[in-house]
Every structure is written in structure tokens, then in C-alpha cells.
């Protein structure tokens, strides 16, 4: 068996959530780029280009945003099912608004995907 090369200066904590590590690196640079850029790619106006950069920035901000709005209190208990596995049962007194939570999560996911697609599509335009 071939011995794996050891990579120096890479910490496990930086790789366990690589998406967040990359976002933390890219986000401040994108903000600086937006502030300093005075050029824009062919096919864009300066307003369209800055709007595109804003959507990209928003995607990376949302990746790093751990805050969740209050959707109520999720209460549940566990019961053993007939097949021997434990299952979670939502308590009837739970005030958690599952529909609002799923809508919020879906909206966030759509914005992240849109921004990351714009990032990929315009990666080679990130210069001035």
C-alpha cells in the first residue's frame, strides 16, 4: 500500500466543514472586490455586475449564518416501534411551525444555490 503524503498546515477543523472554511476565506475578499471594482464584464452594465456580486456575497453570508428565526418550540418524545427501532413522535403541544421553517429553509437554499451558480459562472470575471 502506498503511503499517503502528509499535507502541512491543514487542520482537521478547517476540513470538517470545508464549505464554511471556504466561505470565510472568500466572503471578505468578495466584499473588498465589490467596493474597489470599477470595471465590469462584457454583457453587463456596472449595475448588473454589482447586483450579481451582491447575490454572490449573499450566498456566502447565508452559508455562514447560523441564526434561525423562531419557529416555535419543537416538542417530541421517542417510542419503540414494532420493528424494534426508536422513532420520534411530535408532541401535540408542540408550537413548532414546520411549514414556515421549511419555507424559510427552502428560500435560503434557493438564494445560496443562485449565488453559488453566479459565482461559478462568473469566476473568471473576478478581476479589475
Where are the model-predicted features located?
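Long, non-globular targeting/processing and low-complexity regions
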Residues: 1-125
Amino acid at each position: 500500500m502506498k503511503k499517503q503524503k502528509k499535507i502541512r498546515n491543514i487542520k482537521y477543523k478547517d476540513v470538517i466543514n470545508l464549505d464554511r472554511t471556504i466561505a470565510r476565506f472568500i466572503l471578505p475578499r468578495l466584499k473588498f472586490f465589490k467596493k474597489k471594482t470599477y470595471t465590469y464584464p462584457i454583457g453587463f452594465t456596472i449595475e448588473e455586475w454589482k447586483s450579481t456580486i451582491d447575490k454572490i456575497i449573499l450566498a456566502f453570508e447565508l452559508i455562514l449564518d447560523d441564526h434561525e428565526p423562531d419557529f416555535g418550540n419543537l416538542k417530541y418524545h421517542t417510542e419503540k416501534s414494532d420493528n424494534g427501532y426508536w422513532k420520534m413522535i411530535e408532541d401535540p403541544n408542540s408550537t413548532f411551525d414546520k411549514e414556515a421553517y421549511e419555507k424559510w429553509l427552502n428560500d435560503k437554499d434557493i438564494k445560496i444555490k443562485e449565488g453559488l451558480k453566479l459565482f461559478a459562472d462568473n469566476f473568471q470575471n473576478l478581476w479589475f
